[in-house]
């Protein structure tokens, strides 16, 4: 537990005090946000605000993870490093997108195909590696399994299609999760502090979930219990979640309205990758849909808006994603953010309740 606390505290301090230094560096180089003319008029005042703040979040999390292990003498694990790899890899894709937007002074960076290709490449590397590195003394458990998981692995095993077929299907499944979550966080990042605060809540949930899994691990109990968790390295996954959570919390101080800096795609894709990696390796893939319910609602608003317009020529919302609909309805930005945070918090509490109830009841 000490490693978890150190990781969270260290990343918070680095992010809190490192962000203003990064802001000044960005301002000197003129790296400011480009705002579309067809967006909400209230956003025009945000033009020129420093962006690519995700760089601070990523660096703070990486430094905190390393420092926590250095201070406690604990060894990093493959599971923890894989989540950080996925987070950093998607962050690089987002950084390229942000940099092109700034350089070209337009709202489009990477093409949609290039962006998806980058996300896909990073996701494939993560998924393939996650099925490698069997642990000695843990029945050869790999960081990920080919089972579809809800609150833990279910009997639905993709390996039923053979070793090769199961691996291919798992990679596809992991890509779907990674792409959906990273793009969901990206769509949510439209108002000051919204995505940062919502993601912090989900990461806090994973600190609790992975810590609980560690205390009830099939590999640490002296007597194996029927409801133990066959998760590889759950304690280190909690360390990663704490490191990223602390980084987000420190960044939120500067990202809250009126934002002094935006995380950009660098941050939103990276945070989505961290959540996806934690869900896959902690065997809570479907639970993430509930924990990240706000991201799901916002993504659905875009899907419904696009689908309705293509089929009927009419829009369901005044503007999508959903937060912009309420902006055009006259809600203040801070009001929307706080209410959406409340919704995000309710989803997180509900998800944690379902997770704990499953363990208590054995259902």
From Swiss-Prot:
GO terms for biological process: cell division; cell wall organization; peptidoglycan biosynthetic process; regulation of cell shape. Its main location: membrane. GO terms for cellular component: plasma membrane. The chain crosses the membrane at residues 3-23, 55-75, 76-96, 116-136, 158-178, 190-210, 237-257, 261-281, 286-306, 340-360. The keyword Transmembrane helix applies. Catalyzes the initial step of the lipid cycle reactions in the biosynthesis of the cell wall peptidoglycan: transfers peptidoglycan precursor phospho-MurNAc-pentapeptide from UDP-MurNAc-pentapeptide onto the lipid carrier undecaprenyl phosphate, yielding undecaprenyl-pyrophosphoryl-MurNAc-pentapeptide, known as lipid I. This is Phospho-N-acetylmuramoyl-pentapeptide-transferase.
């Amino acid at each position: 537990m000490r490693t978890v606390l150190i990781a969270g505290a260290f990343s918070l301090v680095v992010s809190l005090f490192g962000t203003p230094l990064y802001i000044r560096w960005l301002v000197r180089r003129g790296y400011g946000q480009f705002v579309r003319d067809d967006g909400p008029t209230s956003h025009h005042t945000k033009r020129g605000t420093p962006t690519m703040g995700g760089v601070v979040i990523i660096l703070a999390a990486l430094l905190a993870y390393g420092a926590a292990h250095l201070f406690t003498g604990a060894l990093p694990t493959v599971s923890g490093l894989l989540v950080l790899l996925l987070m950093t890899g998607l962050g690089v894709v987002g950084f390229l997108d942000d940099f092109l937007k700034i350089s070209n002074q337009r709202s489009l960076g990477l093409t949609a195909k290039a962006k998806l290709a980058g996300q896909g490449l990073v996701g494939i590397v993560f998924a393939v590696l996650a099925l490698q590195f069997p642990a000695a003394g843990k029945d050869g458990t790999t960081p990920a399994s080919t089972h579809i998981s809800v609150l833990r692995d279910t009997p639905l095993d993709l390996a039923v299609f053979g070793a090769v077929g199961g691996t291919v299907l798992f990679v596809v499944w992991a890509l779907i999760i990674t792409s959906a979550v990273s793009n969901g966080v990206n769509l949510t990042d439209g108002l000051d502090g919204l995505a940062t605060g919502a993601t912090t809540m989900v990461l806090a949930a994973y600190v609790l979930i992975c810590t609980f899994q560690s205390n009830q691990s099939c590999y640490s109990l002296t007597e194996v219990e029927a409801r133990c968790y066959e998760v590889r390295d759950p304690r280190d996954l909690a360390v990663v979640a704490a490191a990223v959570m602390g980084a987000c919390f420190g960044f939120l101080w500067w990202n809250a309205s009126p934002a002094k800096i935006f995380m950009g795609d660098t941050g939103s894709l990276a945070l989505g990758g961290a959540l996806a990696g934690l869900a896959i390796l902690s065997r809570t893939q479907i639970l993430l849909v509930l924990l990240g319910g706000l991201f799901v609602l916002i993504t659905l608003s875009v899907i419904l808006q696009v689908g309705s317009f293509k089929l009927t020529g009419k829009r369901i919302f005044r503007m999508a994603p959903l937060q912009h609909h309420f902006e055009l309805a006259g809600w203040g930005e801070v009001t929307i953010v706080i209410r959406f945070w409340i919704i995000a918090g309710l989803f997180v509490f509900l998800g944690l309740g379902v997770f704990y109830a499953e363990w208590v009841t054995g259902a």
